[in-house]
């Protein structure tokens, strides 16, 4: 068989360009397919890493118009204790965010800014925390906390983290203590679970115990029998006195299985819940499969093109005594090796560029063997025609002269080439449409100006003690035009904060953003009726509301109308702007189109985000350095992370891109 291989190598040398292009095509196709398959498998098995996933449910509230996952603490506690079918429950505050910690003392003091989640101790009984050291029961002690392994190694190195102290230099929301002792270290969670790798510590036993207005908590329950979930909700809905609580008049409960949360598109509007688009994932997987199909067809055409050049030597070997089965086996083996070589190179590329794959390179067996199966199928299909056709022609016909493809073989090649070009053109057109959609999302007008505006989050110390000092020093700097404040980054997240008010005897709902009086003018948001807030409005005792145009159409509001907000403040409509989008366009067809947007002005509101507008032509590097140094001077615990408003969309749609 050496002559067959020698002839094959000679043929490859003669067709270097074609052989190289085929290998490159298969490598790229397999690499793309496996990278998409890794993501698809990760999403398909989302949250299934937890052994009790089928019995874990999240408590949701539903009305005739909407559904949401956040709960009032006493309401969640009432539900968790309402049925013997609920074996365990946990209540989580996902809003704490990052907290500035210091470790050590005096000269060897080190600082870190790490995410914190407060919760009730039942979380370790519901979810699978894989203990590395310490004890999971440490959450029963309000002084202790759980750390992910990566964080423990980053902070404490290879030494044991158990018993080490973390001192918070700022308040931890929903917790009374600032000093935490590491009681346990758990193995990091993968990306495909709702639980984040954060510092877990117990929720304060007195926080929000009697607060029936604070919808900030998530509640998960563990059931003994998942089939009883509807009965549990039905019994609770009948027994609980909803009518006694103004905020619960139209509410009913619903349990959502943990594994179903990821693809619940109606939950995309909250950033602390991981979500995905199944349709988008399926389309991406289908596209990657088509790319592999194109590469395989190209491979088949290549092997068919080699038939006339190899058929004579193949049949000479048959005359010399090689059996047809043996010849066909080796021809198929060549195709298999060709495909497997391409697949092996694609795996090496995945290892080299693992950082480019969402969630890192975690190839499960099903993905590896799926790709291997496709490579074997490619070899089988590509080797079928040469193996069968080239060995079935009578030797006397072949040895009498040159030989080409039969009319059927030529028609087959023409059909394959035609199909290949058709699929390629379809993919190119689809890619152009997808690119256009992404560009539309990224360039979508949010209704406000974002040029030369940098946003930085301030810690509580600066917000409460040094805000005036911070503001005056910024306004006195030559490269800064003005500074305003808001409760969040406008247009930077999928989340909208919902509010409600009593107006003319009816309840109206809207999304809102707390802002300083000069925020709208700084962001170039103008009023087309009434006016926007001004600096002197900061002294006003009532809340001043500036709505977008949807409020006029849907709520029949007018300038000067007064209302009572659900959080207890008197409010007055100051004016109306054009339509403004304060969150992403992910949900533009649903939630953003449903409710109007209000900018709420009152200086007493908590607004940790500073919007700093730079002068045209200002040296951004020098300005940011000045701000950083000033923040470090005012509060060493503030670790500023600057972001320009015009970059929000790039980060927001990173997954689509």
Language model features by range: what are they?
Residues 31, 35-36, 254, 335-395, ...:
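Small-residue-rich transmembrane alpha-helices
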Residues 11-43, 54, 413-437, 448:
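Short, strongly hydrophobic transmembrane alpha-helices
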Residues 119-132, 145-276, 472-653:
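Mid-to-C-terminal secondary-structure elements
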Residues 5-21, 25, 297-338, 392-403:
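Intracellular coupling helices
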Residues 12-15, 22, 43, 59, ...:
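Generic structural signal for small/hydrophobic residues in well-ordered secondary structure
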Residues 1-5, 9-10, 14, 50, ...:
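Membrane-helix entry/capping segments
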């Amino acid at each position: 068989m050496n002559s067959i291989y020698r002839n094959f190598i000679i043929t490859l040398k003669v067709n270097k360009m074609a052989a190289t292009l085929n290998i490159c095509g298969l490598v790229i196709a397999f690499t793309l397919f496996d990278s998409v398959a890794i993501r698809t498998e990760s999403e398909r098995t989302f949250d299934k890493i937890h052994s009790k996933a089928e019995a874990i449910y999240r408590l949701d509230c539903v009305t005739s118009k909407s559904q949401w996952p956040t709960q009032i603490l006493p309401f969640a506690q009432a539900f968790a204790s309402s049925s013997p079918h609920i074996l365990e429950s946990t209540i989580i505050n996902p809003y704490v965010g990052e907290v500035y910690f210091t470790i050590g003392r005096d000269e060897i003091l080190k600082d870190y800014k790490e995410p914190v989640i407060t919760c009730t101790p039942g979380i370790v009984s519901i979810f699978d925390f894989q203990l590395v050291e310490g004890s999971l029961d440490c959450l029963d002690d309000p002084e202790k906390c759980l750390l992910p392994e990566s964080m423990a190694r980053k902070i404490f190195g290879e030494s044991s983290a158990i018993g080490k102290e973390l001192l918070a230099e700022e308040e931890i929301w929903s917790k009374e203590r600032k000093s935490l002792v590491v009681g346990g270290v758990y193995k990091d969670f993968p990306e495909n679970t709702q639980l984040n790798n954060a510092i877990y510590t117990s929720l304060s036993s007195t926080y929000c115990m009697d607060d029936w207005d604070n919808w900030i908590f998530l509640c998960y329950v563990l059931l003994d029998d998942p089939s009883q979930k509807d009965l549990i909700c039905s019994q609770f809905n009948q027994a609980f006195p909803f009518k006694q609580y103004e905020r619960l008049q139209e509410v009913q409960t619903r349990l959502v299985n943990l594994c179903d949360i990821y693809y619940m598109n109606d939950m995309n509007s909250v950033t602390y819940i991981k979500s995905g688009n199944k349709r988008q994932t399926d389309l991406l997987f289908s596209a990657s499969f088509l790319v592999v199909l194109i590469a395989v067809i190209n491979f088949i055409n290549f092997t068919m093109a080699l038939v006339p050049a190899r058929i004579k030597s193949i049949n000479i070997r048959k005359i010399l005594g090689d059996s047809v089965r043996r010849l066909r086996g080796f021809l198929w083996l060549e195709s298999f090796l060709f495909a497997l070589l391409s697949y092996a190179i694609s795996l090496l590329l995945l290892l080299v560029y693992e950082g480019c794959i969402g969630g890192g390179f975690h190839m499960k067996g099903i993905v590896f063997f799926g790709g291997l199966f496709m490579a074997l199928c490619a070899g089988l299909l590509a080797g079928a025609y040469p193996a069968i056709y080239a060995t079935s022609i009578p030797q006397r016909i072949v040895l009498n002269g040159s030989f080409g493809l039969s009319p059927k073989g030529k028609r087959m090649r023409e059909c394959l080439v035609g199909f290949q070009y058709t699929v390629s053109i379809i993919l190119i057109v689809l890619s152009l449409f997808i690119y256009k959609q992404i560009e539309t999302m990224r360039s979508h007008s949010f209704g406000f100006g974002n040029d030369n505006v940098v946003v930085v989050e301030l810690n509580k110390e600066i917000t409460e003690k040094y805000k005036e000092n911070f503001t005056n020093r910024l306004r006195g700097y030559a490269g800064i035009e003005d500074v305003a404040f808001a409760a969040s980054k406008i247009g930077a997240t999928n989340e909208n904060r919902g509010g409600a008010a009593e107006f003319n005897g009816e309840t109206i709902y809207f999304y809102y953003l707390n802002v300083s009086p000069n925020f709208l003018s700084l962001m170039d948001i103008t009023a087309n009726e009434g006016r926007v807030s001004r600096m002197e409005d900061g002294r006003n005792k009532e809340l001043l509301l500036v709505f977008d145009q949807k409020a006029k159409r849907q709520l029949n509001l007018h300038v000067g109308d007064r209302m009572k907000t659900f959080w207890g403040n008197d409010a007055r409509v100051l004016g109306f702007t054009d339509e403004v989008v304060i969150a992403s366009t992910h949900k533009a067809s649903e939630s953003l189109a449903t409710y109007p947007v209000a900018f709420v002005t009152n200086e007493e509101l908590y607004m940790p985000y500073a919007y700093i507008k730079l002068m045209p032509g200002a040296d951004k590097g020098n300005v940011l350095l000045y701000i950083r140094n000033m923040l470090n001077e005012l509060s060493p615990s503030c670790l500023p992370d600057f972001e320009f408003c015009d970059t929000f969309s790039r980060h927001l749609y990173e997954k689509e891109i």
